[in-house]
Amino acid sequence: MFNINIVREVLINLNLIFMTDPIADYLTRLRNAIQAKHRVVEVPASNLKKEITKILFEKGYILNYKFVEDGPQGTIKVALKYDAVNKVNAIKSLQRVSTPGMRKYTGYKDMPRVINGLGIAILSTSKGVMTDKEAAAEKIGGEVLCYVY
């Protein structure tokens, strides 16, 4: 019998299955790995996913990450961060905001506050992918990709 996850990965890597929202897929893979208490999760790479992963690392939500150049697009290995005592993950919630069917944009004056400033919003701006606080400091708005807290 075939493992359906392995078959799906092979088809995705061969570009035989088209994903309508790769960012939602990325966030879902992270959520599933957190729920299953996995230490490492491997996801197909893209430039946008690399930038989101970099922000998650810089803000302390993940332990480490590594880009692996294998195949046509490569993969990202993300080491999830857990509390040593309680075994609780640093990421409480990953929420996709802007979707391909419903884009959400914000100006720098109307920047969303995630959990009263305790979380972050990740935005795609004209100057690259950055957090809500960085975008407000640069006085630029953009597409709200996701909330993390």
What residue spans do the PLM features occupy?
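Core subunits and conserved enzymes of cellular information-processing
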Residues: 2-149
